[in-house]
Amino acid sequence: MARVTVEDCIEKVENRFELVLLASHRARLLAAGAPLTVERDRDKNPVVALREIGDETITAEDLKEQLIHSMQKYVEVDEPEAETVPLLSSSPAAAAVAPQSSSDDKNVQFDFMSEEDLLRGLENLAPPTETDDEGE
């Protein structure tokens, strides 16, 4: 029964490898509870899937799209790149500046730090001191 079914399907899906992929995907869908589009006739799910493809009750293109969608684990979304974040200065003059009214917010300027400056600053940081709790 399966050999005749495969021969019928080769006319619909020319590549045997693709036919096997599509039929196995459809068989898994049937096992998961998808509705049948042909009579079962005591056939197992792979044979029913091949018969559905051969009788064109489901299209190979739809099955292919479903298969691709089921295999995708990550969908890449284009997001804009993050803008440079302003650096807060540790100078006494900057510390003296307090939040003011919203009209003054338009005139605020920030200092920017390059990546090299940031790396140099991180290198100059002292390592944290060890405590008794870290040894356990």
Swiss-Prot record:
Where does it sit, as one GO cellular component term?
DNA-directed RNA polymerase complex
Q: Which domain of life is it from?
A: Bacteria
- Provide the reaction this enzyme catalyses: RNA(n) + a ribonucleoside 5'-triphosphate = RNA(n+1) + diphosphate
EC top class, in one word?
transferase
Family annotation (Pfam families): RNA_pol_Rpb6 (PF01192)
Q: Name one GO biological process term.
A: DNA-templated transcription
Q: EC number(s) of the enzyme?
A: 2.7.7.6
Gene3D superfamilies listed in its UniProt record: 3.90.940.10
Give any GO molecular function from the UniProt entry.
DNA binding
SUPFAM superfamilies per UniProt: RPB6/omega subunit-like (SSF63562)
* Assigned keywords, A-Z: DNA-directed RNA polymerase, Nucleotidyltransferase, Transcription, Transferase
Name the InterPro entries on file: DNA-dir_RNA_pol_omega (IPR003716), Pol_omega/Rpo6/RPB6 (IPR006110), RPB6/omega-like_sf (IPR036161)
Record's subunit section: The RNAP catalytic core consists of 2 alpha, 1 beta, 1 beta' and 1 omega subunit. When a sigma factor is associated with the core the holoenzyme is formed, which can initiate transcription.
Q: Which family does it belong to?
A: Belongs to the RNA polymerase subunit omega family.
NCBIfam families on file = rpoZ
Question: Main role?
Answer: Promotes RNA polymerase assembly. Latches the N- and C-terminal regions of the beta' subunit thereby facilitating its interaction with the beta and alpha subunits.
Q: What is the protein name stated in its UniProt record? A: DNA-directed RNA polymerase subunit omega
Q: Per the UniProt entry, what species is this protein from, by scientific name?
A: Methylorubrum extorquens (strain PA1) (Methylobacterium extorquens)
Taxonomy of origin reads: Bacteria, Pseudomonadati, Pseudomonadota, Alphaproteobacteria, Hyphomicrobiales
